[in-house]
Amino acid sequence: MLDCHLYREDLERILSANLPWESLRGRRVLVTGATGMVGSLLVDTLASMMDDHGFELIAMSRNREELERLFSIHSDHEGFRMIEHDVNEQMDLSCDTIFHCASNTHPRLYSSDPIGTITTNVIGLRNLLEMASSGDGRFVFLSSVEVYGQNRGDVDAFDESYCGYIDCNTVRAGYNESKRVGEALCQAYGSQKGLDFVIPRLSRLYGPSMRLDDSKAMSQFLLNSARGENIVLKSKGDQFFSYCYASDAISAILHLFFHGESGNAYNVSGLDSDFTLADIAYELASMAGTEVVFDLPDEKERRGYSTATKAVLDISKVKATGWMPEVSMKDGLRRTVSSLASRL
């Protein structure tokens, strides 16, 4: 768990939701990608509830050192375990409730490890679906706004039925297409093996638990601001995207785990959180008392970047289930910068 009062406040906000935790009694819950931004906050949330509601929790990651650093605080929970494992490899493990958070999620890895980007969302997912299909629990596959591809110019915001353009004959398409295949694989297991699953499609995320090596533009802006540096913008900054603060994302994931309709996908985004990259860059520069500077990327770096220029999510469907985001963009940026500054 991060040693930061703002992170603990975020955790308390998530836990304040009235969710039917007792339905997890007797379950064994697995979180893959446990050391990532989403997985780590999800593990800390679940660990806070496991004793009172009688379920086991397994945090899985390829990085044992990070597991120990983040979660040794939970070692006093009798049913808590940390497992170092790559989901692409077969595993001798039985879990009936699974949150599949493991994935390459930033441009540098899309470019440098395109094979791993695809396999985690397909082969790793299949291994976990096989495990889940032998039980009667629920499976959560974290998908992404990236499944929509580029806006064709015919809508202002993507609902869950939208299908945009993806140039599939590129390295960068591996992330988008593997998330699409992953969703289809969940549907196949639901149809053929009766698996109960739900798919949150997350917008671009940020928050105190973000990794310091995250190469997404937004993450780099936040790190620049936390260090008191100029914000480095590697484009004109006119990309118009939806964003979501990490605690709102976890709140939505858990809400959909308990209340989402089986077999459905749901867009997840933040409170009043649709902005251009330039808007965010100038806001963070203002917070840090610095400036925005422009630095065009080289070819290798550019290969990992999204080509989308407008990716705004319509979250009417998830709101209809009773969930609402709580953290505004300005507040989320401020909280993230303050938290990151304490870690640097």
Q: Predicted regions: what is each one?
A:
Residues 84-120:
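NAD(P)H-binding glycine-rich loop region in Rossmannoid oxidoreductase-like domains
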Residues 144, 183-208:
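Conserved beta-loop-beta element that borders a ligand/cofactor-binding pocket
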